[in-house]
Amino acid sequence: MHCPFCRHPDSRVIDSRETDEGQAIRRRRSCPECGRRFTTVETAVLAVVKRSGVTEPFSREKVISGVRRACQGRQVDDDALNLLAQQVEDTVRAAGSPEVPSHEVGLAILGPLRDLDEVAYLRFASVYRSFESADDFEREIQALREHRGVATPG
């Protein structure tokens, strides 16, 4: 790897450690030319294939910004959004494919968001599933009630 300071084409790894619950490797490097040290983080590439066919890297930030819009005005904090984004990434990575359709990312968001905030879930689902009428909302609300009944036996 090139040194970010002097652009020397080689560097030596001094230390390697797993981070992000084993999803990344943090490497401490040293440049033989200028002697400066720097850190790199390596992760397995996860790509999202959009409907248009364009491929882009998976982005937790993009998941968070989409969900944040659905949570606008709701009592959902940044920690909860970060946890949701981590859950979505874990679900998508668990599929075992280096490329995943954007549709699968949306599906991976729905479950954790439903558990986090039902109103935000309905907002997100209405856009994601292209609701066209009040009947679509009624069906989704009924499914939420059924899920709640299964989740909390009473």
Curated annotation (Swiss-Prot):
PROSITE patterns the record matches: ATP_CONE (PS51161)
unnamed zinc finger span: 3-34
Keyword check for 4Fe-4S: no
UniProt entry tagged with the keyword Plastid: no
Named cofactor requirement(s): Zn(2+)
Cofactor binding comment, as recorded: Binds 1 zinc ion.
Protein name per its UniProtKB record: Transcriptional repressor NrdR
Organism encoding this protein: Mycolicibacterium paratuberculosis (strain ATCC BAA-968 / K-10) (Mycobacterium paratuberculosis)
